[in-house]
Amino acid sequence: MKNNCTSLKSSIDEEDELKTDHEIDLEKGLLPEYDSKEEGALPLYSDHARLSNSPNTHRENNPSRSTDNSSPLLIKLLISFTSIILFNAPAVCYLKYKDAFFKNYGAAEWTLFGFWCLVCTLALIFLTYFYETWTKAVKVTVIFLAQCVKACGKGIKHFLKKWENMPMAFSEVFLFNIFGGALRIISRHFFGKRWGLKCSLADHIIFAILSILVFIAETVKPGSIRVNLIRKMGHEAKQQVNEYTAIPLHEMNPESEA
């Protein structure tokens, strides 16, 4: 029976099997010989060998990134303690100035001092535990204040550059107050205390509003309240000088007449 059995495989299938057995992977190279006697030995290109020889994890490849970047506990404690000392420094300086630092303390003073030490200790623990939170808050606050100061500086610089006549406006408001005060003193002398320095609140408010309006008007448009005689006289003098010193065209070009 064995000799009479014919194989179901065709000649084409046998050729394909021979080709696949003898094919060489150009990327992997020749397959090493597999020794079944060695325990645990697997072909290098098998799935189990790939799993066993898998590359290291991301943490093993990059050990520096796995380290904690947070500040050490000692540095946190030192910075928190320094902030508490700076907070208590004004009180200590005041007690030193009054010569009352640990002098003539009674039961109430020592109780208050112990309570304050307890509060400082709890604050130290709190600041150390929430170090990242409050330091970020302080940084944001400092940056915000710096930006506010910078913006205010730019605004003041722009204001002073644009409103160059503010000193004159201040001086005019000052003169206006002196003139108004003199009138009120004179009116008090002639018409009694009702119109003098002891006026009602409404009179003071009206006088303050008038002073503010004078300042704004003189700042926005110089000479709107006062008559700028100096500038006017200077402008007229320049015009007269230009008229007298102007040279006629025929004197400048005598050849044109000829």
From Swiss-Prot:
Major localization class: membrane
An annotated GO cellular component: vacuolar membrane
Keyword Chloroplast tagged: no
Pfam families membership: WTF (PF03303)
GO terms for biological process, alphabetical: meiotic drive
Annotated keywords: Membrane, Transmembrane, Transmembrane helix, Vacuole
Subcellular location per the Swiss-Prot or TrEMBL entry: Spore membrane; Vacuole membrane
Polar residues bias locations: 1-10
Bilayer topology term: Multi-pass membrane protein
Residues annotated as transmembrane: 73-95, 110-132, 169-186, 201-223
Disulfide bonds: none
Region (Disordered): 1-21, 47-69
Assembly notes: Homomer. Interacts with other proteins that exhibit high sequence similarity.
Membership in a protein family: Belongs to the WTF family.
Described function: Acts as a suppressor component of the dual wtf meiotic drive system, and can suppress but not confer meiotic drive by compatible poisons. Wtf meiotic drive systems promote unequal transmission of alleles from the parental zygote to progeny spores by encoding a poison and an antidote from the same locus; the poison is trans-acting and forms toxic aggregates in all spores within an ascus, wherease the antidote is spore-specific and targets aggregates for degradation by the vacuole.
Protein name per UniProt: Meiotic drive suppressor wtf10
Source species of the chain: Schizosaccharomyces pombe (strain 972 / ATCC 24843) (Fission yeast)
Lineage of origin: Eukaryota, Fungi, Dikarya, Ascomycota, Taphrinomycotina
